[in-house]
Amino acid sequence: MVPTQMFLTRGVGVHKEKLASFEQALRSAGVAYCNLVTVSSIYPPNCKIVPRARGEKLLNPGEITFCVMARSETNERNRLTSASIGLAVPTDRRTYGYLSEHHAHGETDEETGEYTEDLAAQMLATTLGVEFDPNIAWKEREQVFKMAGKIVRTLNITQSAIGKPNRWTTVIALAVFIPEENIPKRRR
């Protein structure tokens, strides 16, 4: 089973109970009705990213649904928490790319998002033989990767929130793989 479609989503939940906060985040992300199974970080060859709204319509309640998930939570007042998924897509769509996940405290959306995007690009670059200096800033490395002609696109989806008093705050970011049997034949 190699997925051919996936979507990116994110959510935030706040509740006095930790588990209920996670459930609220899943609802916010639009995937609470699925049985999520987390997998490692490979973006499948020939996989297409579809809009969240389309992807949600292709999932069924109770279905086993594979995803890459980043999750962070806090019950500390005013603590910034964030979760992000980064993606690096190779120029040759017949080969695989990378998804990375990161969760943090005290990092902004931009910091967390850039970190995951950079991490996914680094993982892909090393498998493609692209040489780079890991000590230079992400924006410079991004240009090196793209100029090498082997990485066509990088992106991230990130969610952050600030902890509320006497409440759990959970943030999640996900890459959700759509089961092949759910994709109408004409859309494959």
For each of these PLM feature ranges, what is it?
Residues 1-188:
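Helix-coil modules at protein/domain termini and other flexible surface or pore-lining loops
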